[in-house]
């Protein structure tokens, strides 16, 4: 078992291809390579999606919570190094549940646990919490492929 480490935004930008407005991970709090990761997203009123979802009661869209969880899982996969031509595809989701709305001012704490990984296909158990309460959880499948494949 490795010692847990943290990753700042500069390293996240090296590991993920996502950029504003689609980079949904601000910092990795703890990562144990090939095992688990805990990351955070500071949700602010300045998020572009709040303009339309919903103007009178802004709520982070569930699909973007899942995307943030997938990016967290990608960081677990790429935590040591991302091949220059590698791209991370979202390949499937099972058992998604949304239990608490995520609002402006919330700090979304995201965890991913690697369940299986073989031949570039990875399965994760993921969970997002706010103030210690589960906001969303799912099992996701992701695939790492060459950009040209």
Swiss-Prot record:
It is found in: Cytoplasm. SUPFAM superfamilies: Thioesterase/thiol ester dehydrase-isomerase. One of its GO terms (molecular function) is (3R)-hydroxyacyl-[acyl-carrier-protein] dehydratase activity. It is an enzyme of class 4 (lyase). InterPro entries: FabA_FabZ, FabZ, HotDog_dom_sf. GO terms for biological process: fatty acid biosynthetic process; lipid A biosynthetic process. Its main location: cytoplasm. It holds the Pfam family FabA. Keywords: Cytoplasm, Lipid A biosynthesis, Lipid biosynthesis, Lipid metabolism, Lyase. Belongs to the thioester dehydratase family. FabZ subfamily. Involved in unsaturated fatty acids biosynthesis. Catalyzes the dehydration of short chain beta-hydroxyacyl-ACPs and long chain saturated and unsaturated beta-hydroxyacyl-ACPs. This is 3-hydroxyacyl-[acyl-carrier-protein] dehydratase FabZ. It comes from Polynucleobacter asymbioticus (strain DSM 18221 / CIP 109841 / QLW-P1DMWA-1) (Polynucleobacter necessarius subsp. asymbioticus). The lineage of its organism: Bacteria, Pseudomonadati, Pseudomonadota, Betaproteobacteria, Burkholderiales.
């Amino acid at each position: 078992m490795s010692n847990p480490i943290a990753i700042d935004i500069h390293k996240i930008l090296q590991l993920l291809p996502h950029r504003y407005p689609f980079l949904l991970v601000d910092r990795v709090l703890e990562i144990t390579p090939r095992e688990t990761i805990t990351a955070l997203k500071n949700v602010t009123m300045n998020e572009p999606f709040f303009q339309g979802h919903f103007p009178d009661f802004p709520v982070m869209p569930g699909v973007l919570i899942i995307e943030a969880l997938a990016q967290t899982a990608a960081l677990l996969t790429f935590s040591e190094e991302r091949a220059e031509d590698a791209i991370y595809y979202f390949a499937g989701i099972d058992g998604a549940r949304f239990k608490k709305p995520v609002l402006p001012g919330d700090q979304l704490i995201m965890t991913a646990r690697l369940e299986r990984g073989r031949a570039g296909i990875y399965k994760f158990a993921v969970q997002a919490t706010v103030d210690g309460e589960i906001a969303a959880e799912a099992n996701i499948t992701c695939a790492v492929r060459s950009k040209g494949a």
